[in-house]
Each structure stands twice: as structure tokens, then as C-alpha cells.
Amino acid sequence: MAKYEILYIIRPNIEEEAKNALVSRFDSILTDNGATIVESKDWEKRRLAYEINDFREGLYHIVNVESEDAVALNEFDRLAKINGDILRHMIVKLDA
């Protein structure tokens, strides 16, 4: 199984309940498509290097995933691009 790290930035003015729902929704997208979540945790609220959609800060969330194929990652990528609450996201394949 290949190991991946997903980092995404959530808009800072989201309510706590909505943020938790967003995180659980994207975690379930990964698991429903065959990936195994090793760890999913909030990182911290950080200042952005440049302004994104009028925001200067963002809530960082990091997910470590194991997957045999890229189906779950492609679906995560597709849905993260069209979600207005996620400012940016990045998927990195880790060395085994």
C-alpha cells in the first residue's frame, strides 16, 4: 500500500460545527473509496503567505492515508477543488 499525506486549508471564519462536518465528510470520501486513514488531525490556524479569497489566515488540517490505488485521492481532489470552504489542498506521496 502506498502512503500519502493530504494537507488542506479551511477558511478561518467557518463555525466549529461546520468545520467538524467538513472534516468528517472528506474523511469519509477517502474511506468510502477504499483508502485507510492512519491519522486525521487539525494542525493549527496559520497566517498565509499571500491572501487567498480575501483571507489572510487559514485552518490547516492534515490527513495521513494508505491506499492501493488513486481512486480515493482523485475523488478527494475533485471534490476539494469545488468546495468553497477549502481554500487550498495538496496531496503528497510519501516514501515507503
UniProtKB/Swiss-Prot annotation:
The keyword Repeat does not apply. Keywords: Ribonucleoprotein, Ribosomal protein, RNA-binding, rRNA-binding. InterPro entries: Ribosomal_bS6 (IPR000529), Ribosomal_bS6_sf (IPR035980), Ribosomal_S6_plastid/chlpt (IPR020814), Transl_elong_EF1B/ribsomal_bS6 (IPR014717). Binds together with bS18 to 16S ribosomal RNA. PANTHER family: MITOCHONDRIAL 28S RIBOSOMAL PROTEIN S6, SMALL RIBOSOMAL SUBUNIT PROTEIN BS6M. Belongs to the bacterial ribosomal protein bS6 family. This is Small ribosomal subunit protein bS6.
